């Protein structure tokens, strides 16, 4: 099939590349001329494990192309996929301006049947708005389909190529057949396409992300109780996770969730609920707890240093909001760093992939350096992201480099007994403090 993907951000680039990998001819469209130029030359613009290899192969075999021209990009494409940003507005609602602008433009371009697929995370009723926007200037037949993505950053290629389910919202039998053919290469062992109406598909995406955010937040609340009661959240996590009704995933406590999806989608669903006169109290609590959790290490650090952080060198390991990505959007690390800077701390940080993005976000306010260079003469180390590189470091080297053997672990990377044996002062989430 010939496919056009509008938007070359995280979702758009993964979607375009993976559909090209299954034999389709894909044209990706973006208004950012510099990005299009880089992609056309084989310079990938995001970090995602396994993506670059597929990207370069399909670019080389001419199945993957890039352009800034919407009309030319969609000219011969039966399928037009919208993978556009829906950033939160000041009130938390999703900003649909990019999607509706493209829909309006498509209405002036389309002259024969097309299937418009919305992969962006959008409020309920967006498919109808896209339909209306296109129809205002278009006499040709077309269908608008809601097909939300469920890609985990760090596992996006795997999730796309081997999906646990594909949600498709459409009332058109014609579009349903085309979408079934599109996903057939990914469904060779089991047909996991779930068809429903557009509104249900749109809400499914919000419901999924909000539920996972709630699960994380619940465990963070349990972790707080563990600290007050003297219990161990890791043991409780195992006790909960072995219950098949609950499951093992998303039960790890920490310093809150970040990224481009969970914070934005929870806020958007709360706002959407208010639009139909419903107060979504659980999700309001999720937002409140998560904002506090992001900064939960800061008062601990201040307490350790008797509320005097001026001139203290704090090392930070981990900047991305999660491992295996360079995405720092809403990353807890940034919230912590900004607060520590306000207190007069000097920050030296390391991340395997996210340092370039962090430099653009924080400028020259912090030192970005190597993993062990960051801890030279540091007064304390903060672990903000659970990269595998941090799980088994050279502890002897750490001991010799650090001014004080003090660790504040926001991701529970290390075992308490190990820290005790090595003589570290160690604070983590929902577990007892190890004193040196």
List where the protein language model places each region.
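Structural/interface elements that position substrates and couple domains in central-metabolism enzymes
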Residues: 1-436
């Amino acid at each position: 099939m010939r496919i056009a993907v509008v938007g070359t951000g995280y979702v758009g680039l993964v979607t375009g590349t993976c559909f090209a990998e299954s034999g389709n001819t894909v044209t990706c469209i973006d208004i950012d001329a510099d990005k299009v130029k880089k992609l056309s030359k084989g310079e990938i613009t995001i970090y995602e494990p396994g993506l670059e290899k597929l990207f370069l192969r399909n670019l080389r075999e001419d199945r993957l192309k890039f352009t800034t021209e919407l009309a030319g990009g969609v000219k011969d494409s039966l399928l037009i996929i919208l993978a556009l940003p829906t950033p939160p507005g000041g009130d938390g609602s999703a900003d649909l301006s990019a999607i509706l602008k493209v829909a309006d433009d498509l209405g002036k371009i389309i002259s024969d049947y097309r299937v418009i697929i919305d992969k962006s995370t959008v409020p309920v009723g967006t498919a109808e708005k896209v339909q209306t926007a296109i129809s205002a200037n278009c006499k040709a037949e077309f269908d608008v389909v809601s097909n939300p993505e469920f890609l985990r950053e760090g596992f996006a290629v795997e999730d796309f190529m081997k999906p646990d389910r594909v949600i498709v919202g459409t009332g058109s039998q014609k579009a349903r057949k085309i979408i079934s053919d599109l996903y057939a290469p990914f469904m060779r062992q089991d047909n996991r396409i779930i068809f429903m109406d557009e509104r249900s598909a749109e809400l499914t995406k919000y419901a999924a992300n909000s539920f996972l955010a709630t699960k994380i937040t619940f465990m963070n609340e349990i972790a707080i109780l563990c600290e007050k009661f003297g219990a161990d959240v890791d043991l409780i996590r195992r006790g909960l996770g072995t219950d098949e009704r609950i499951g093992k995933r998303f039960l790890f406590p920490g310093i809150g969730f970040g990224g481009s999806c969970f914070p934005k989608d929870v806020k958007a669903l709360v706002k959407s609920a208010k639009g139909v006169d419903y107060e979504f109290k659980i999700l309001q609590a999720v937002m409140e707890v998560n904002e506090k959790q992001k900064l939960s290490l800061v008062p601990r650090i201040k307490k350790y240093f008797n509320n005097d952080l001026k001139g203290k060198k704090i090392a930070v390991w981990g900047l991305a909001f999660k491992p295996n990505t360079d995405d720092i959007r809403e990353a807890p690390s940034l919230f912590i760093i900004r607060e520590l800077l306000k207190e007069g701390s000097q920050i030296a940080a390391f991340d395997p992939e996210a340092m370039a993005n962090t430099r653009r976000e924080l400028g020259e306010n912090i030192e970005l350096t190597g993993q062990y260079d960051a801890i030279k003469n540091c007064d304390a180390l903060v672990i903000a992201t659970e990269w595998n590189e941090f799980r088994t470091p050279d502890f002897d080297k750490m001991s010799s480099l650090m001014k004080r053997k003090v660790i504040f672990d926001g991701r529970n990377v290390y075992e308490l007994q190990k820290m005790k044996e090595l003589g570290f002062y160690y604070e983590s989430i929902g577990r007892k403090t190890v004193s040196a």
